[in-house]
């Protein structure tokens, strides 16, 4: 998928999604593309390392950070064969659903608009990562 800008625009056409980022997780742990001016553009290499690392129990108990925002993990199947999705929610008054999808080379991160249920993002994420996986991304 060479045109990430077009892909980001296509994902953001879904009115339930407020922000999106595509982040490398193997060789290059940086944001490849994101919504211009979006919060998820600030995802750090350290956060990617925590998301894809082998120590799952620490962030399941204490939560994790995505783009500097504290989140509590709802469901972690990010590294599970056949699933590849993590559901979380930002902490604080403006709690938003966060969904992270795993492909062979990248993580896709979605943040829902205020009031959007995480299950809706989860379903959308499964559709999106299926498409990326079929393209080898």
Swiss-Prot record:
User: Is Cytoplasm included in the keywords of this UniProt record?
Assistant: yes
Biological process according to GO:
actin cytoskeleton organization; positive regulation of actin filament bundle assembly; regulation of actin filament polymerization
Q: Which InterPro entries match?
A: PFN, PFN_euk, PFN_sf, Profilin1/2/3_vertebrate
Disulfide bond sites:
none
List the GO terms this entry assigns under cellular component, sorted alphabetically.
cytoplasm; cytoskeleton; nucleus
Where, subcellularly, is it found?
Cytoplasm, Cytoskeleton; Nucleus
Membership in a protein family: Belongs to the profilin family.
Q: How does it assemble?
A: Interacts with ACTRT3.
Q: In UniProt terms, what function does this protein have?
A: Binds to actin and affects the structure of the cytoskeleton. Binds to poly-L-proline, phosphatidylinositol 3-phosphate (PtdIns(3)P), phosphatidylinositol 4,5-bisphosphate (PtdIns(4,5)P2) and phosphatidylinositol 4-phosphate (PtdIns(4)P). Slightly reduces actin polymerization. May be involved in spermatogenesis.
This chain belongs to the protein called Profilin-3
Organism of derivation: Bos taurus
Q: Which gene encodes it?
A: PFN3
């Amino acid at each position: 998928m060479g045109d990430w800008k077009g892909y980001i625009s296509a994902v953001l056409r879904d009115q339930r999604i407020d922000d999106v980022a595509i982040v490398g997780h193997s060789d290059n742990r940086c944001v490849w593309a994101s919504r211009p001016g979006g919060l998820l553009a600030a995802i750090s290499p350290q956060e990617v390392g925590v998301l894809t690392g082998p120590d799952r129990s620490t962030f399941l108990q204490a939560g994790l950070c995505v783009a500097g925002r504290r989140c509590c993990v709802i469901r972690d199947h990010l590294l599970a064969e056949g699933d590849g999705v993590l559901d979380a929610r930002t902490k604080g008054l403006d709690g938003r659903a966060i969904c992270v999808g795993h492909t062979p080379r990248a993580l896709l991160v979605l943040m829902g608009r205020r009031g959007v249920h995480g299950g809706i993002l989860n379903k959308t994420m499964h559709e999106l990562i299926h498409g990326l996986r079929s393209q080898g991304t």
